[in-house]
């Protein structure tokens, strides 16, 4: 039940981000409006919270040893400590996608401020760039690496965490790398938005 709920929440978040990009698209050729920016920002906050909630449910499936979820079966076992739940998530392509999308969503909201992005057009373009990128990544993840794919006949035991992922600090290293990538992407979007007034 929880897995299906998280999957539908993920789909809803994807639709919300796509709608946000659609609402903000006029800022590419116009000066933008306060209403569109408010809607876009609130939509981004709402979608980020939905993504975080969905990811939290995915983590709970690792802790609960729910081997009906394909990624849990492939990278976890009942003998693996719950401490390695996040590490096991990183060991799968689905988890890598999800964590990067979640980090990009959070970092982009942290970098959004009216002091740097002084005009509605700049704010609108920044939010549009981020929402369009997130929408494309989410569609790609859901279509090629769905983290909530189910196994029709679930096994009693998972395959376990690959030995290479048991090394200490590997998770922290990947988290730091993803944070840097997300910060770089959001900063690039912000810079382009700030210096594209005449476009």
Regions found by a protein language model. Give the residues of each.
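Polytopic transmembrane helical bundles with strong interfacial aromatic enrichment
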Residues: 1-199
